Amino acid sequence: RIFKKKKKYKTLLNVAVPAGMWQKAEEIICDDKDREYLRKIRREYKNLVRNIWNPFDSSHEGILGCTTVNRLYITPIGDVLVCPYVHIKIGNIFKQTLKEIVDFGFKIKHFRNHSDLCLAGEDKEFIRKFMTKQGQSIFKPADASEIFKKKDFIEK
């Protein structure tokens, strides 16, 4: 077995993401069967963590949900991505303040609204609509202001 039940270390699980050379590999996307298996081993091996799971839940069943915008990724050239696995930039720290960038990111419904699914590795509709642009990568992220339409933003 890869995992030991009585070890004191944590193992971070990341699901496969259709990005880079795997951008069109839809078959790798985590499905209901995969999620059920992950829930099963989470309960069995209490040292497993995922970014979407609640780490303080002693029953090992709680879901925090996707943490886009809450955990940003800043590239060496200053592009601010909503997640290292979602290759969409919401701004650039050399052009805007981080507060302006975060405020803009939370105006996008997909990032503001709760999702139990990892947008990058589980939400097939989000992946098809926003993560499959030609040449899109961590080095050439899609620009949120260009790919999202008016209906994708919250109204104030």
What is the role of each PLM region?
Residues 80, 85-156:
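Flexible mid-to-C-terminal extensions adjoining Fe-S/redox cofactors in radical SAM and related proteins
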